[in-house]
């Protein structure tokens, strides 16, 4: 028997506002986002991610995003020790989809902005204008030390200065095809990129620190943030408010997209049993690595993403917001997310991506008021 969930009551004005976008955070690294010996164990492949994104497109997901990870956490599960590369993966996925928006992540310490500008323009051509770029500054020092490109620990406090110059070069090249930018980190001398993107290139960021939000307010089209807690869907609201306030200072509209993991089943009890099983198998060695790395940055303050990721409360899934319950309960909680001012969308992960997306599309999404505008499904995806 499926658990009943109370219906939210919205005014017409609220319903018009509550049209929340849904994205999938594809598993570019092994085992997705569960650091547990009890979770599904799998390697990242193009075929797996193709199946995930095609299924997401079938169920009217709005976008797909891949991260970039250059060194994992080890442990019994070898967590994130095995990763594909973001731009090449998303170029492939752009070629086998037709509607869904596609976002790759640039580890900006590893890629010159002029190269990213050209790669993005190429994937814009492949996708027919469906591509955008997520910019990350880099927080896990061993990822870059192993290649001899870590700029020193002062970078922790200057990384958004670096990113500000980086995005200015990108905007020059995408907008005019030329850059003569001169800064502390980058020097462009009649740098050229052509062809330019067919549509304005979307730039996204995932800043939760004051510096990160100030950057997003000035340069990003929207900002990712972590959900918080287990079955506390609106606990992230203060973060969304901070983002709105930062954007108001720049006169721009920059909404928040919130990261959640969905663990759903027929009943609340069945879903909770899954969650407890995953927690019981937590890979303590990999989690210790995460905690150790989070303590390396002593200069960025206490409000960065990595501080939340390593919190012992729910480190088994890096402390992203977690929605555990029946299909109706998860639908209700996602409608609550949509009710938060500034929350324009969610980025979802699943304990099992293929079955999770299908269950979401068939059993959860039809119950969501904030997705009531979607057309009916017309065909099946294998």
Curated annotation (Swiss-Prot):
A molecular function GO annotation: alkanesulfonate monooxygenase activity
Keyword Oxidoreductase attributed: yes
Binding site for FMN: 68-69, 134, 143, 159-160, 209
Reactions accelerated catalytically: uracil + FMNH2 + NADH + O2 = (Z)-3-ureidoacrylate + FMN + NAD(+) + H2O + H(+); thymine + FMNH2 + NADH + O2 = (Z)-2-methylureidoacrylate + FMN + NAD(+) + H2O + H(+)
One GO-annotated biological process of the protein: nitrogen utilization
Alphabetized UniProt keyword annotations: Flavoprotein, FMN, Monooxygenase, NADP, Oxidoreductase
First-level EC class: oxidoreductase
Pfam family, one: Bac_luciferase
E.C. numbers: 1.14.99.46
Keyword Nucleotide-binding carried by entry: no
Induction profile: Up-regulated by the nitrogen regulatory protein C (NtrC also called GlnG) and repressed by RutR.
Function: The FMN-N(5)-oxide reacts spontaneously with NADH to produce FMN. Requires the flavin reductase RutF to regenerate FMN in vivo.
Family under the similarity heading: Belongs to the NtaA/SnaA/DszA monooxygenase family. RutA subfamily.
Name the record gives this protein: Pyrimidine monooxygenase RutA
Organism encoding this protein: Escherichia coli O8 (strain IAI1)
Lineage summary: Bacteria, Pseudomonadati, Pseudomonadota, Gammaproteobacteria, Enterobacterales
Gene behind this protein: rutA
């Amino acid at each position: 028997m499926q658990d009943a969930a109370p219906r939210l009551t919205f005014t017409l004005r609220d319903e018009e506002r509550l049209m929340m976008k849904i994205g999938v955070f594809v598993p570019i690294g092994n085992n997705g986002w569960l650091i547990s010996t009890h979770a599904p164990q799998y390697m990242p492949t193009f075929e797996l991610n193709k199946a995930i994104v095609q299924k997401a497109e079938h169920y009217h997901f709005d976008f797909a995003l891949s991260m970039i990870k250059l060194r994992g956490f080890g442990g019994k599960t070898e967590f994130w020790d095995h990763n594909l590369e973001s731009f090449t993966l998303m170029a492939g996925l752009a070629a086998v989809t037709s509607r869904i928006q596609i976002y790759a992540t640039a580890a900006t310490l590893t890629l010159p902005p002029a190269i990213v500008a050209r790669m993005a323009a190429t994937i814009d051509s492949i996708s027919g204008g469906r591509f955008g770029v997520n910019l990350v500054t880099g927080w896990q020092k061993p990822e870059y030390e192993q290649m001899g490109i870590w700029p020193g620990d002062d970078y922790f406090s200057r990384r958004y200065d670096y990113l500000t110059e980086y995005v200015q070069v990108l905007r020059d090249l995408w907008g005019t095809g030329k850059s003569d930018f001169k800064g502390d980190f980058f020097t462009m001398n009649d740098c050229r990129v052509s062809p330019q993107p067919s549509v304005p290139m979307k730039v996204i960021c995932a800043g939760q620190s004051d510096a990160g939000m100030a950057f997003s307010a000035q340069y990003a089209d929207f900002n990712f943030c972590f959900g918080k807690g287990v079955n506390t869907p609106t606990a992230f609201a203060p973060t969304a408010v901070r983002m709105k306030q930062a954007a108001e200072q720049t006169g721009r509209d920059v909404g928040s997209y919130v990261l959640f993991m969905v663990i759903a089943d027929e009943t609340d009890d069945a879903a909770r049993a899954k969650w407890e099983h995953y927690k019981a198998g937590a890979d303590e060695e990999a989690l210790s690595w995460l905690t150790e790395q989070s303590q390396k940055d002593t200069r960025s303050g206490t409000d960065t993403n990595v501080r939340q990721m390593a919190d012992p409360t729910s480190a088994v899934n890096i402390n992203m917001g977690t929605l555990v319950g029946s299909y109706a309960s998860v639908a209700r909680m996602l409608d609550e997310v949509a009710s938060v001012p500034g929350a324009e969308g969610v980025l979802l992960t699943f304990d099992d991506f293929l079955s999770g997306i299908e269950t979401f599309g068939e059993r959860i999404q039809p119950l969501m008021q904030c997705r009531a505008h979607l057309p009916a499904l017309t065909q099946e995806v294998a």
